Amino acid sequence: MNKSVCDARFRSKKSPTPVKYQLLTLMTLFITVTGCGTALMTKDPNPPVVGQPVIAGNLENPKISEASGLASSRLYPGLLWAINDGGDDPLLYAVGIDGADLGTFRVEGAKNFDWEALASFRWQGTAYLLIADVGDNWEQRQTVTLYVVKEPVITAAGIDNGRAATIAWQIRFTYEDGPLDCEAVAVDAARQRVLLLSKRRLAPVLYELALQPIDQDTIAVAHRLTAVPHLNWPTGMDLTPDGLSAVVLTYNNGYLFKRRQNEDWSNTFKRKPQRLRFDRLFQQEAVSFGFYGKSVFVTSERIPAPLVRIDLEESDKKP
């Protein structure tokens, strides 16, 4: 979320009560002085560096003005999907791996209160996109929402702008220890779990949630797995298709975590990650592995938004 939008939201929302939110008020003062997304952050870890960065292009569609989520298609190797931050219409933007504009889909029945993450996955032979409406700067939202839509199919004629995508199911949920801000969400399809990494705590916390709700009327609960103290303000997360690697984006860096076979993610995130080699972007909040899991794409909330590809294996330049 860029500073102007952040400040506007702070001004437009009803102020919390002074007694209950004293600490939050102090955080807000720091944010006002230093800029949204940079307050109370300590230095990120300095682990071994991996990857070869390439500027793949710029996001061509001018309507993608605040890219808060990025996900690789699970149908087409040359396609990425992107979303805008809160305040935009409920739209999915199709983007080439060179940043080319490939069209737009409207998500019928969804609202973009504060869309902050996008994930792609396959489940029971079908490709899906998960849109995470989980942003909560004030940590006041009693419930937040995940929208799951079938990934749109692109014909030879391409995408007609304005076509609709339908919601397959949605998950309304809360966190077991109360409201919090989150921008990093990923899907572990093999385990049928959604992973969520909190943002504004001094030590981010990893949570998990069932991918399928018990029913549409039940408010689910995301359960705490572990604190991840060596990361600062995570802004994005993704898993490889095989579920053996995770990438986490922060305002300063990107980090690669390798999971061992049959290991819980709580143990994976306790180990020291590898740091991705690329120059930090302004307000970087969107990250995705490529189709084959051999590279990572990163973009930012700005215009023009550069699309950076970090190749993880020298011998495999596939996206």
Regions found by a protein language model. Give the residues of each.
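Positively charged n-region of N-terminal signal peptides that target proteins for export
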Residues: 2-3, 20-21, 70
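Bacterial N-terminal signal peptides that target proteins for export
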Residues: 11-24
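Bacterial N-terminal signal peptides
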Residues: 25-34
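Sequence/structural signature of beta-propeller domains
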Residues: 37-319
